[in-house]
């Protein structure tokens, strides 16, 4: 099992179902055994309607499915979920709510994002996101940014074992508490979103860290979760920065060692 207690979850590097060993050669023509990530297809149904099939790591299918539906506005935080059923043999998950659902129109209106494996945003999410304003007065101390990166790099992870994955982490002050990985960064953030929703975690006093780029997709998902501070070791896109400024999200990128760049929400940073 992954290391877990109340509101704490980290990667399980001992789960053999997530990796496999493949024989190969190194640069000197020596035979080696390489550990690689297992990627699978997860099909998500909402009530009786098939929504999407995601290529992903199948470690937390329920969190991924719920987070995906939340971030696509297909379920709301006030909706009552009647049941969640996962068929491990078919890699199929069915989420049932009390609402009647018909997403024919919303599924036709989609934007292919810059996310790994072609993330998709449905409906009017881009139009709606500008109406959200993050009002949290949480602060992040200058020294925490370096401490957060250092602590995350020391946590045993699938990335350190095999590479080929992105990571997303929820931070409480300067302490990592929830760490999700996946082959696509949008999947990793959806897992975070689903976990926080199902465990009723307050986002207003948390910090979000991602290994991925700070694109519009990543900013939108962070804002939808109402998390006030987003950090990445990677860089920014112009649309991502624009959305962060409109929604009052603190946006910190290129956080490597003791260096970083902040392009939005400067008031939450304390030196």
For each feature predicted by the language model, list its residue ranges:
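Feature captures the catalytic cores and cofactor-binding loops of soluble hydro-lyases/lyases
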Residues: 185-271
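Surface-exposed beta-strand edges and their flanking turn/coil or helix-capping segments
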Residues: 57-59, 65-70, 107-110, 131, ...
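Intrinsically disordered, low-complexity regions enriched in acidic/Ser/Thr/Pro/Gln residues
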Residues: 2-173, 178-179
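Alpha-helix initiation and capping sites
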Residues: 162, 183-186
């Amino acid at each position: 099992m992954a290391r877990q207690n109340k509101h704490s979850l980290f990667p399980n590097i001992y789960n053999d179902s997530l990796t496999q060993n493949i024989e190969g050669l190194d640069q000197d023509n020596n035979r080696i055994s390489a550990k690689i990530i297992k990627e699978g297809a997860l099909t998500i149904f909402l009530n009786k309607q098939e929504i999407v099939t995601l290529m992903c790591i199948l470690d937390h299918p329920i969190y991924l499915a719920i987070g995906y539906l939340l971030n696509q506005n297909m379920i709301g935080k006030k909706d009552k979920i009647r049941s969640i059923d996962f068929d491990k043999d078919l890699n199929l998950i069915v989420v049932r709510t009390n609402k009647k659902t018909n997403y024919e129109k919303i599924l036709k209106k989609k934007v292919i994002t810059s996310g790994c494996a072609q993330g998709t945003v449905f409906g009017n999410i881009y139009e709606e996101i500008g109406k959200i304003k993050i009002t949290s007065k949480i602060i992040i101390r200058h020294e925490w940014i370096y401490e957060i990166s250092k602590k995350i790099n020391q946590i045993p992870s699938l990335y350190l074992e095999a590479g080929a994955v992105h990571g997303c982490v929820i931070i409480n002050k300067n302490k990592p508490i929830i760490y999700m990985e996946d082959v696509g960064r949008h999947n990793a953030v959806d897992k975070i979103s689903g976990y926080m929703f199902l465990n009723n975690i307050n986002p207003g006093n948390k910090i979000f860290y991602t290994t991925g780029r700070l694109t519009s997709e990543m900013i939108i998902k962070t804002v939808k979760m109402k998390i006030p501070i987003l950090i990445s070791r990677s860089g920014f896109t112009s649309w991502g920065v624009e959305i962060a400024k409109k929604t009052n999200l603190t946006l910190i990128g290129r956080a490597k060692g003791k260096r970083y760049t902040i392009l939005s929400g400067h008031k939450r940073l304390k030196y």
